[in-house]
Amino acid sequence: MPELPEVESVRRGLEPYVVGRSFAAVEVHHPRANRGQEAPLSALLVGRKIAAVARRGKFMWLEFADEDHSDPARDVLFIHLGMSGQVRIGEVDSPHVRIAAVLDDTTRLSFVDQRTFGYWRLGPWLSMAHIAPDPLETDFDLTAAGRRLRAKRTVVKAALLDQTVLSGVGNIYADEALWAVQISPLKKASALRQRDAVAVISAAADVMRAALAVGGTSFDALYVNVNGESGYFDRSLHVYGRGGQPCERCGEEILKTVLGGRGTHYCPSCQNRGVGRKSAAN
């Protein structure tokens, strides 16, 4: 699933094409791409002017010029990429185009989604108010986020993925952040010292900034930016996807386990803070 750097790459790519433009036509080619919307998407969007492309964590939306942007109940267009969603500029020759839109300057937007977990939905911004701030926001409160992380009774890896603690961190960047600060993903979040909780979140922010600088992480053709280009942060990963390979820091074999249904990669030797070595290897 696209994480913060991948979604932000799409947001930045989309912004110059759509801000100040209005929807001229919208066609939905698959019902799941507009699920939960009672009225036809074309009736809801045609004629509306786009004022901004916004994002929090993994969630992206379009703001409209005819809405009060300070009103939490304002309508926005949520564009959720799901597991494999892409927003592409121009016509795309693919059987997986789920939504096709045309703007008033003839710019075409294609929503391509092979696995159909993504969607476009018009609704109140308030519906995502429970999503926590993300570490790349300018006014992000690192101390408060550290306290939220320590308040969770799960292991720290699961707590990092909780979008009510901080948003935008997924499997890839959680593993990389924990490796960077040498903390085991199996350690209880509630057992972290405040300085360690802050260090983990700071590391997550650092690794996501580095990923964003190279367009995010692409393991296959399912994640590309608006121009169809892949990111290449996968070349810089230290632990994620490296199960069975030697740790770049200590040489120990990287382990892969499953936590909460998610594949988790870590070094049982140098990421041994907070759990015994025997527990870390199980």
From Swiss-Prot:
Q: Which cofactor does it need?
A: Zn(2+)
Look up keyword Heme and say if it applies.
no
Q: Its catalytic activity?
A: Hydrolysis of DNA containing ring-opened 7-methylguanine residues, releasing 2,6-diamino-4-hydroxy-5-(N-methyl)formamidopyrimidine; 2'-deoxyribonucleotide-(2'-deoxyribose 5'-phosphate)-2'-deoxyribonucleotide-DNA = a 3'-end 2'-deoxyribonucleotide-(2,3-dehydro-2,3-deoxyribose 5'-phosphate)-DNA + a 5'-end 5'-phospho-2'-deoxyribonucleoside-DNA + H(+)
- Zinc finger residue ranges, FPG-type: 238-272
Q: Which UniProt keywords apply?
A: DNA damage, DNA repair, DNA-binding, Glycosidase, Hydrolase, Lyase, Metal-binding, Multifunctional enzyme, Zinc, Zinc-finger
Q: Name one GO molecular function term.
A: class I DNA-(apurinic or apyrimidinic site) endonuclease activity
Entry binding sites for DNA? 96, 115, 152
Q: EC number(s) in its UniProt entry?
A: 3.2.2.23, 4.2.99.18
- Pfam families in the cross-refs: Fapy_DNA_glyco (PF01149), H2TH (PF06831), zf-FPG_IleRS (PF06827)
Q: Which GO BP terms apply? A: base-excision repair
Task: Write out the function statement from the record.
Answer: Involved in base excision repair of DNA damaged by oxidation or by mutagenic agents. Acts as a DNA glycosylase that recognizes and removes damaged bases. Has a preference for oxidized purines, such as 7,8-dihydro-8-oxoguanine (8-oxoG). Has AP (apurinic/apyrimidinic) lyase activity and introduces nicks in the DNA strand. Cleaves the DNA backbone by beta-delta elimination to generate a single-strand break at the site of the removed base with both 3'- and 5'-phosphates.
Record protein name field: Formamidopyrimidine-DNA glycosylase
According to its UniProt entry, this protein's organism is: Corynebacterium aurimucosum (strain ATCC 700975 / DSM 44827 / CIP 107346 / CN-1) (Corynebacterium nigricans)
Identify the taxonomic lineage of the organism of origin. Answer: Bacteria, Bacillati, Actinomycetota, Actinomycetes, Mycobacteriales
